[in-house]
Amino acid sequence: ERRAERESQMRADEEFGSQVQYLTQQRRARLPWRREGRSFDEEFRELRNVDEEERRDMMIE
């Protein structure tokens, strides 16, 4: 049972990781000049900020 739990957690982590990767690629496609020399953490923080901005924009509309 515990192994199944661990496996589903791993699957969830993988899924989340590939989502972040996908979003990062999308983001980079939009902002090619920001790509060089950025750490994953910076990318991720910026992705989160963009999500929050987009949510705010949706609320305003």
Curated annotation (Swiss-Prot):
Keyword 4Fe-4S: no
Keywords: Disulfide bond, Protein synthesis inhibitor, Seed storage protein, Storage protein
Source taxon at top rank: Eukaryota
A GO biological-process term: negative regulation of translation
The keyword Disulfide bond is assigned to this record: yes
UniProt GO molecular function: nutrient reservoir activity
Transmembrane segments: none
Subunit structure and binding partners: The mature protein consists of a small and a large chain linked by 2 disulfide bonds.
Remarks, miscellaneous: IC(50) of translation-inhibiting activity is 17 uM (small chain) and 300 nM (large chain).
Function: This is a 2S seed storage protein. Inhibits cell-free protein synthesis.
Family assignment from sequence similarity: Belongs to the 2S seed storage albumins family.
Protein name: 2S seed storage albumin protein
Organism: Cucurbita moschata (Winter crookneck squash)
